Amino acid sequence: MIEIRFHGRGGQGAVTAANILASAAFKEGKYVQAFPFFGVERRGAPVTAFTRIDDKPIRIKTQIYEPDVVVVLDPSLLDTVDVTAGLKDGGIVIVNTEKSKEEVLEKLKKKPGKLALVDATGIALEILGLPITNTAILGAVAKATGLVKLESVQEAIKETFSGALGEKNAKAAEEAFNKTVVYEL
């Protein structure tokens, strides 16, 4: 089983991202689970969401404490939250940032096995006209993890957002897939 933990802020779409990733994996015949964890429910407050993906039925219903993959939608969280808490050895960290690999590693409490960086905010602003990074970051997740195909992510996005909005969000995921830089550490 692969466990993914998303870190974002209220209003950024971390919960939607977790659900879309689960839908994409389900399309590929996997068993999935996606759910949020809310502390103080307000716009801008830290939000955590989770996705589990497996080849077998998933029976556990707890939060994810030892993720294989951590996805950070808001880079300012690197200064306030230990996003690598419980990260499995050799785990993958995916960060929406313009910063360098060295700058990001300096902020992580645990060194991942793989680090993926993409300016999902820049991509979202360019394509969507809004700094909502959840669909763009899923392109980075597809590239860095290989858990799902980009096409499955795009299909799931178009099912979540209809019409032109779905097309634009699918394009944002593709752009992020192409621009994500993955470092083996």
Swiss-Prot record:
Domain of life of the native organism: Archaea
Alphabetized InterPro entries for the sequence: Oxidoreductase_gamma_subunit (IPR051626), PorC_KorC (IPR011894), Pyrv/ketoisovalerate_OxRed_cat (IPR019752), Pyrv_flavodox_OxRed_cen (IPR002869)
Catalytic reaction(s) noted: 2 oxidized [2Fe-2S]-[ferredoxin] + pyruvate + CoA = 2 reduced [2Fe-2S]-[ferredoxin] + acetyl-CoA + CO2 + H(+); 3-methyl-2-oxobutanoate + 2 oxidized [2Fe-2S]-[ferredoxin] + CoA = 2-methylpropanoyl-CoA + 2 reduced [2Fe-2S]-[ferredoxin] + CO2 + H(+)
Any Pfam family hit: POR
Keyword terms, alphabetized: Oxidoreductase
Enzyme class: oxidoreductase
Cysteine disulfide links: none
Enzyme Commission number(s) of this protein: 1.2.7.1, 1.2.7.7
Sequence intervals crossing the membrane: none
Record-level Gene Ontology MF annotations: 3-methyl-2-oxobutanoate dehydrogenase (ferredoxin) activity; pyruvate synthase activity
Subunit structure: Heterotetramer of one alpha, one beta, one delta and one gamma chain.
Full protein name: Pyruvate/ketoisovalerate oxidoreductases common subunit gamma
Organism whose genome encodes this protein: Thermococcus kodakarensis (strain ATCC BAA-918 / JCM 12380 / KOD1) (Pyrococcus kodakaraensis (strain KOD1))
Gene: porG
